[in-house]
Amino acid sequence: MSGKPTIHLIGTGGTISGAGSSATTAAYESGCLEASELVAEVEGLSKFSNIQTENLFATGSENLGPNQWRILARRIEELTKSKNVDGVVVTHGTDTLEEASFFLHLVCKPSKPVVLTAAMRPATALSADGQANLFQAILAATIPQLKGHGCLLYTSPSPR
């Protein structure tokens, strides 16, 4: 055992896992990158955490609603009851991020930190924000003091 907390990352799609044909194009496909691919692109995570990944959905969040959020909530509850998981991070699209966060905050009563995150620009963009958001969300999920605060949300400030 490394002594580092284990964080379980659930991918649901969205811009954070989107990819375009070039770094300068505005066109991209949501949800085409796996959660494991996102983690592989973020330097430094292994210094403070062990990461497990899974992909629950792979779509734009405009296609996610209460039915999918119930499935997500059940999975979060399962994971936070596991002795092998110290926190959960969910990547989600921004179109319905607020609704998903609110829904999960109301229905989940996690005993461990749960943090949602997203991105405004796809992973392949020149100014992609998903890596920094994912880093900070995973870091937050390692903080034991966040237990009992429900489902939290992390996104970085937009550049001006």
State each model region's role.
Residues 125-153:
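Short, glycine-/small-residue-rich phosphate/pyrophosphate-handling segment
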